[in-house]
Amino acid sequence: MSMFNKVTKTFQWGDKTVVMETGEIARQATGAVLVNIDDTVVLATVVASKSAKPGQDFFPLTVDYIEKTYAAGKIPGSFFKREAKPSELETLTSRLIDRPIRPLFPEGFYNEVHVVIHTVSLNPEVDADIAAMIAVSAALSVSGIPFNGPIGAARVGYINGEYVLNPGQTARKNSQMDLVVAGTEAAVLMVESEAQQLSEDIMLGAVVFGHEQGRIAINAIHELVRDAGKPVWDWQPAAKDEPFIAKVTQLAEEKLRAAYQIRSKQARTQALREASASVLESLKAEGADFDAVKVEALLFDIEAKIVRSQILAGEPRIDGRDTRTVRPIEIRNSVLPRTHGSALFTRGETQALVVSTLGTERDAQRIDALAGEFEDRFMFHYNMPPFATGEVGRMGSTKRREIGHGRLAKRALVAVLPTKEEFPYTIRVVSEITESNGSSSMASVCGGCLSMMDAGVPMKAHVAGIAMGLIKEDNRFAVLTDILGDEDHLGDMDFKVAGTTAGITALQMDIKIQGITKEIMQVALAQAKEARLHILGKMQEAMGEAKTEVSSFAPKLYTMKINPEKIRDVIGKGGAVIRALTEETGTQINIDEDGTITIASTDSAKADEAKRRIEQITAEVEIGKIYEGPVVKILDFGALINLLPGKDGLLHISQIAHERVEKVTDYLTEGQVVKVKVLETDEKGRVKLSMRALLDRPMGDSGRPAPAERGERGDRGDRGDRPERGERRERREPAGADQQQQQQQSTGAGEHSGQMDA
């Protein structure tokens, strides 16, 4: 009899088989489920504290997604040969899992919950993120922890006009969309996507399709819970102290309503702080027994009620706008004088200083991902320091939120970037948020597009982004355009849409409540399009098209094509030739396997010099052409002349002069620069040269050209074997001269050979 009480559920999901197991691995966790989708295997565990910490006023949920390199049969490349800090992909996947499960824990549940997911086996054609979301949903469901799930999740592609469920890496290369949707059986909770300028209807159809497919996983999880679920915790939220709530409401409501009539964020924030302090002072004066943390939570609830009721009643929003108006926009380009491209994008009290930098192929980010190595030549980094919200805080490592916002902005812009052939630069965009009052990630999208255009990046179209919000009470709802920070906190949805005039390039949605219908999403998308087109109009006024030239401070890229067989000559033995080229010309040189060479330099003269030298190195010796080069070696039977870098030819003693030459050194010295004509080349690449062919024949006493000298007569042989009269017979070469010539010529070429990757 086995020591394990193992329960397994198998179901077919599209063209993939999914196996869920629990009861064998990680039995001491509150809940643990192993999910296998066509050899991609993830282990999700969840552990929850039995009680909340005293004074806890928020839900402490932590999600850690971890990829193990052994899952792909690899050993980590770091010095310590073990997994270290989370990669960007691991951080983004952790956020992807966190977002749909967080709203499903009941209000008032403040027990610490830690979700850990390990990817332990990877099929590159099956993404681990979807398997991880299914596994986490199942682990939470079987754990007995208070959780209003399960959730389902699915990836949706759009190929040849049809939606595709969970496309793999290969299929996604032909997909116009990469969308991940998660939700409960009844409602969508989270959407994350990028697209190739698709319409609102196509995007909404993908969300609906993905949600329907996610229900298949939800049904299987219900079956697993029936067979292996643990008893549900006997947890009840703390009873509400209605008299105390009424007291706080009486003290605070009027002051809070007055504060929310103030249109300026800073003044409003100050008024809210004063209202909070006043309530606490009044409670102290009355001798009430209270917890300050609970009072702050009550004040937040009162604020939410005030703001939400005003909006649903058709009253102006916090800053005085109606539900459809975008805040005032101001744009300034070329803000920073020495950067390659920059833009300052301000929308109300949200401001982004966005800077673009152009680099060479060497500057591209090389990522050793679990599914395989790849190169990324477009990077978008988002930073938001504490001063952006007028707060004191710590500056340190990049936060998860910053990584997530940067990736969203990147998703929005990547669809309109030029191809590598059209624009071979590596591009890095950095968005510095200098003010924030809602939708800073979408300000980063707008500023990023403008700064790249300012840098001379030939974008296919302008891209703008907008953040939408939602207030919903029963059957009444209001969709808000361009939400403020307070509206984000107090509302029910954060819905970000980016795109061009032609369609959507990125969509992100986080919903805090159940009951968001397809109709509400349609209204939100239509309203977002209206706002997006308005912002695009402002951007086009500020910068109609990209600059035609890159900045004088940016490297200029010059491309040339050589015979791939000549690559080793350009690199040289141990990289000696290319190293000398880059050092002596002050350029960066990149060589592709197909023979494409890219030269990068801020000085066109230096780039031209590098190009000239590469042309010399790779040039072929032409028969009949005259070259000028130094004597590199004197031989008994002639001399080696350098014609091109790495290419020497043999000047035979008989081809030095018209007269008889007894000693080569009487005519030539090493280092002497001479002009020679190429007589012939053979199949082995040996080159025969002549100086004599470029010299006039000396005149005899009669004024006629002197007859050519004859060699030793020896055996005269038959008449037919003799040369015609006046024709010169070449001197016989010493034995082995041909082999010496081959050896000497190959020596020079050999010095420039080397491995391409040296």
From Swiss-Prot:
Q: Where in the cell is it found?
A: Cytoplasm
Biased amino acid composition, Basic and acidic residues: 707-735
Domain S1 motif, by residue range, is 624-692
Which SUPFAM superfamilies does the record match to this protein? Eukaryotic type KH-domain (KH-domain type I), Nucleic acid-binding proteins, Polynucleotide phosphorylase/guanosine pentaphosphate synthase (PNPase/GPSI), domain 3, Ribonuclease PH domain 2-like, Ribosomal protein S5 domain 2-like
Enzyme class, first EC level, given as a word: transferase
Q: Which UniProt keywords apply?
A: Cytoplasm, Magnesium, Metal-binding, Nucleotidyltransferase, RNA-binding, Transferase
Record field: catalytic activity: RNA(n+1) + phosphate = RNA(n) + a ribonucleoside 5'-diphosphate
Give GO MF terms, alphabetically: 3'-5'-RNA exonuclease activity; magnesium ion binding; polyribonucleotide nucleotidyltransferase activity; RNA binding
- Biological process annotations from GO: mRNA catabolic process; RNA processing
Query: What's the Enzyme Commission number for this chain?
Result: 2.7.7.8
Instruction: Report biased composition (Low complexity) as residue ranges.
Output: 736-745
**Annotated Mg(2+) binding sites:** 488, 494
Cofactors: Mg(2+)
Q: Which PROSITE patterns match?
A: KH_TYPE_1, S1
Q: Which SMART domains match?
A: KH (SM00322), S1 (SM00316)
| Sequence ranges assigned to domain KH in this UniProt record | 555-614
Record region (Disordered): 692-758
Stored CDD domains = KH-I_PNPase, RNase_PH_PNPase_1, RNase_PH_PNPase_2, S1_PNPase
A Gene Ontology CC term for this entry? Answer: cytosol
**Family (UniProt):** Belongs to the polyribonucleotide nucleotidyltransferase family.
Known role: Involved in mRNA degradation. Catalyzes the phosphorolysis of single-stranded polyribonucleotides processively in the 3'- to 5'-direction.
What HAMAP family does its record include?
PNPase
Q: What is this protein called?
A: Polyribonucleotide nucleotidyltransferase
Organism the protein comes from: Paracidovorax citrulli (strain AAC00-1)
Taxonomic classification: Bacteria, Pseudomonadati, Pseudomonadota, Betaproteobacteria, Burkholderiales
